């Protein structure tokens, strides 16, 4: 294995370790999370999702405790035949979630591995004692994690190209 390949592998591993240090709380949205309640109809929520261009939202009780998650996927199953069903009847009752202190790589893996094909994860406080899920603290979008990963990959590629250019006769432009 060449010195260049070894260096690249070491740098990639180190970069992965660096990204694991980034916490969900550093990337999540916490103030303006669009939520719903279990009493609303799927028609109301469908209209709200279209208005805000989102594909899902946390379902919370009157104390802000997350009790489920509703996605366009669930809504579409019932929209034409039962538009006035309550969200609580069709929501995901045990959705994947993350916590503010979890690393972004783990949160990203949860989104990818979810059989619900989520592009966002609710961020909850699991120390909330009364419910299985916990109090909603925010939401993290796959798009934001991908942007962060992309920025880090570009930085790493520029570093590698610079290193390669300094150690070879051939110059690579980026």
Swiss-Prot record:
Keyword Repeat found: yes
Keywords per UniProt: CBS domain, Methylation, Repeat
Domain CBS: from-to ranges: 28-87, 91-156
InterPro entries: CBS_dom, CBS_dom_sf, Diverse_CBS-Domain
Domain of life of the native organism: Archaea
CDD domains to which the protein is assigned, alphabetical: CBS_pair_SF
Post-translational modification: Methylated at an undetermined residue between Ser-2 and Asp-26.
TM spans (from-to): none
Name by which UniProt lists this protein: Methylated protein MJ0556
Species the sequence originates in: Methanocaldococcus jannaschii (strain ATCC 43067 / DSM 2661 / JAL-1 / JCM 10045 / NBRC 100440)
